[in-house]
Amino acid sequence: MWFSLFTPQRGDRLPEMLTPHERELAVAEMLLLRRAFPKLDMPEGLIRQFSTPPREPGECVFALTTQTVSADLKTRVVPCQFGGDPDCSACGCVASMALGAVAAHKWGGFIPVGSIFKASLKIGQLRAKPPAPLPAADEQLRILR
């Protein structure tokens, strides 16, 4: 079992939004719950990422490594799966936190995996070809009868 927290858009004032204090309480409770309930399959490092989410999509490993497409299979959703102008400082996406935990892990005990990822991303950007346009929906999804 995994948990996500609500991710608002910038400027939102909604009852689902957690205050910084409520967010820290949620992190503390998830840390306690994972010890009591083994089916809560969230490592401590992942849960702790909720305390320090990325500040912007350019810092989010999940946003940098995925391409989201809307239900019409044509429209790209940017900058991440939430689209629009997400308030990354209040991100509650479990996938973002999981990849953030991987990036924070130290390979060999001293090299942050995130540094390797960023170097790889830069090399890929330098060598990248322009992205191919998405095929028409009927070419991508064939309905069998």
Predicted regions: what they are:
Residues 1-62, 72, 104-108:
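Radical SAM enzyme [4Fe-4S]-AdoMet core and its adjacent flexible, acidic
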Residues 57-61, 68-145:
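Flexible mid-to-C-terminal extensions adjoining Fe-S/redox cofactors in radical SAM and related proteins
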